[in-house]
């Protein structure tokens, strides 16, 4: 099922589930990854889904097409990205878990990025939600990963210094002629 932004969509905080929610107005609800302690005060006043939200939705949806995720996972990632941009409290970078490359890439919101874990050198796929001069707020763009003994799931937020981030290259986009 494909979801499409609608001016009947509504943001609200659900006390029972301790999560930011989005009422999709067709009997469907989206429960974000973000609990009360992670949200700004704006999150606790119900709000409509505005034109800016819809524009960001379509931008993130387009950028997420290349991720190796199911349609449902991509939709979940996009909606969590909207919650993060609109309602997430500022975070401190947690870059010590990742390999530094010594060069600075300044990603743009919606960019597919990757980092490598310092301890295992495992690649981790990310969606850049907000970008600054030195660090970027990212969401995990894969089903799960364990970072320093803590399990992260699709859509979890982490801020990372730009010298750890690399643009993600979509292997499927290369042709045989380019490889030879």
UniProtKB/Swiss-Prot annotation:
Loss of function: phenotype: Mutants divide almost normally under standard growth conditions.
Keywords on record: Cell cycle, Cell division, Cytoplasm, Septation
This protein's GO CC annotations: cell division site; cytoplasm
Subcellular localization: Cytoplasm
GO biological process: division septum assembly; FtsZ-dependent cytokinesis; regulation of cell division
Pfam family for this entry, one: ZapC_N
Taxonomic superkingdom: Bacteria
Main location: cytoplasm
GO molecular function per UniProt: identical protein binding
HAMAP family, A to Z: ZapC
Function, in words: Contributes to the efficiency of the cell division process by stabilizing the polymeric form of the cell division protein FtsZ. Acts by promoting interactions between FtsZ protofilaments and suppressing the GTPase activity of FtsZ.
Self-association state and partner proteins as the record states: Interacts directly with FtsZ. Monomer in solution.
Family: Belongs to the ZapC family.
Protein name (database record): Cell division protein ZapC
């Amino acid at each position: 099922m494909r979801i499409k932004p609608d001016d009947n969509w509504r943001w609200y905080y659900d006390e029972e589930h301790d999560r930011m929610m989005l009422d999709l107005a067709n009997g469907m609800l989206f429960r974000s990854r973000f609990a009360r302690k992670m949200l700004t005060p704006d999150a606790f006043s119900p709000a409509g889904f505005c034109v800016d939200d819809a524009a960001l939705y379509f931008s993130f949806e387009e950028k997420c097409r290349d991720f190796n995720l199911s349609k449902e996972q991509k939709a979940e990632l996009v909606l969590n990205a909207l919650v993060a941009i609109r309602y997430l409290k500022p975070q401190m970078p947690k870059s010590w878990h990742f390999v530094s490359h010594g060069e600075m890439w300044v990603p743009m919101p919606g960019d597919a990025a990757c980092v490598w874990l310092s301890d295992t050198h495992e690649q981790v796929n990310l969606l850049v939600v907000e970008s600054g001069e030195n660090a970027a707020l990212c969401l995990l763009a894969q089903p799960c990963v364990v970072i320093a003994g803590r399990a992260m799931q699709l859509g979890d937020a982490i801020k990372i210094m730009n010298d750890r981030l690399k643009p993600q290259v979509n292997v499927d986009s290369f042709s045989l002629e380019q490889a030879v």
